[in-house]
Amino acid sequence: MTDTPDTPDTPMATGASSRPPLRALTPLEGRVVAVLLEKQFTVPDTYPLSLNALAAGCNQKTARSPVMSVGEDEILTAIDGLKSLSLVFEGSSSRVPRFEQNLARVLGVPSQSAALLSTLLLRGPQTAAELRLNTARLHAFADISSVEAFLDELAERDPALVVKLPRGPGEREHRWTHLLCGEVSLAEAPGLRTSASIEIAPSELEALRISHRELEDKVARLQALVEEMAEQLGISIDPDRLS
């Protein structure tokens, strides 16, 4: 086991932590190291993972965002990159190559934080409540506030490992995302586009204009019909009430 020992559900109050710069991971590198950490807790009997099991975890259809479809050659390339960062090791006690992760030790974070980071890598941006639910098999956080405490500590590190995203339209809670694959564009983060940022194609805009003109024509014809019927019935109608 390469993870740091468990600590209580409160980050150590030692101020903002710093670490040597770690290059941004590729999306596949992030997926590989996160799958290894996940499977270490969910299927410990098969950990360290074989290449075949690792590929299955990377291409898993559930609990993954985005869903990937990658081959073993691509995964081996990602493993080589992770080995160069000491984030992944290859075991030597089996005839079949097996791989294990070293995320917590390299980043200098407790196992609770590593669980949060791996879940963000696997599932994308999530609220603290979602993270508490989705990390349950990796670490059972006591409550949402303890999740937020670890997220805040990760955000205060130098460099930061996570960031809190602005609330999008209709969202009640802030979501968090990891920064292990580089900085994120808040304007392009999922669910954060506002109505002002929505682009309408020229053809769609012209169709809206035509529809608007047709609607105006129908209203005008109905108004004329009402006025004609009122005149036939001898009813006086204020034109302003029809506009």
UniProtKB/Swiss-Prot annotation:
Keyword Membrane: no
Source superkingdom: Bacteria
Biased composition (Low complexity): 1-11
SUPFAM superfamilies with a match to the protein in the record: Winged helix' DNA-binding domain
Keywords from the named record: Plasmid
Gene3D superfamilies cross-referenced by the UniProt entry: Winged helix-like DNA-binding domain superfamily/Winged helix DNA-binding domain
UniProt region (Disordered), positions on chain: 1-23
Keyword 4Fe-4S: no
Family assignment from sequence similarity: Belongs to the UPF0502 family.
Protein name: UPF0502 protein Rmet_3697
